[in-house]
Design a protein with these regions (language model features):
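Conserved catalytic core of nucleotide polymerization and phosphodiester-bond processing enzymes
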Residues: 1-229
Length: 229
């Protein structure tokens, strides 16, 4: 409904601000350790179904950054004098793992050539040279890259990109035309999960899926366990 009436955008904005207020602005000061004057999170090793670390009290893995209001929350975290915060992240690790697991020749070639994978995806989907890719096209390709490998639906992609469903469907179709072995791998993963009742990571961790045969689309997301474990 976003875009069809101005009140919808206002409601969504209100929800976002209410989330920031309740989860961060009001809650974070209450979690400051009185002795150290700092916030100390807890990292959990055996809580998530995928095997990934999670964080609680507070969840420091989920401090907002996607919009300007969220970025203001991050400004509340200040290092000690003489110290700095830094972050390290693998470059597009989920896509690299997907390229390895699926053996998709086009994606592997893009990584081997050192291409910007999002620009390379946009170039192939929109059938233009990589130097002609616009910022908007790259942004859409980035959203598609990370959404599609986790089983995002046409509706979900349309909502995330704020486009109509026709454009979202064309993007997904173009994506799988560009990376056909990824589509094949994803379909095989779902079939395998339905047959054995679980998904197994590269390192042998099993995630059992008792509702794998339901019609719920969340099944598509759960079969992505191999990517994010």
């Amino acid at each position: 409904l976003r875009g069809k009436h101005e009140i919808v955008g206002k409601i969504l904005e209100h929800r976002g601000l209410k989330k920031l207020l309740g989860t961060y602005i009001d809650a974070l000061p209450l979690l400051i350790n009185k002795e150290t004057g700092k916030i100390h999170t807890s990292f959990n090793q055996t809580v998530t179904a995928t095997g990934r670390l999670s964080s609680s009290n507070p969840n420091l893995q989920n401090i907002p950054i996607r919009n300007e209001d969220g970025k203001e929350i991050r400004k509340a975290f200040i290092p000690d004098d003489g110290c700095e915060f830094f972050s390290a992240d693998y470059s597009q690790i989920e896509l690299r793992i997907m390229a390895h697991l699926s053996g998709d020749a086009n994606m592997i070639e893009a990584f081997k050539e050192g291409d910007d994978i999002h620009a390379a995806t946009a170039a192939k989907v929109y059938k233009i040279s990589i130097d002609k890719v616009t910022r908007e096209q790259r942004s859409k390709a980035k959203t598609a890259n990370f959404g599609i490998i986790y089983g995002i639906s046409v509706f979900g992609l349309a909502e995330r990109m704020n486009v109509d469903r026709k454009e979202a469907k064309e993007l997904i179709d173009g994506y799988f035309e560009t990376y056909p072995q990824i589509k094949e791998y994803m379909d095989k993963s779902i079939d395998l999960a339905r047959g054995q009742g679980y998904i197994e990571t590269i390192f042998g961790r099993k995630r059992y899926l008792p509702d794998i045969n339901s019609r719920n689309s969340v099944v598509r997301d759960r079969t992505s366990t191999r990517l994010n474990s």
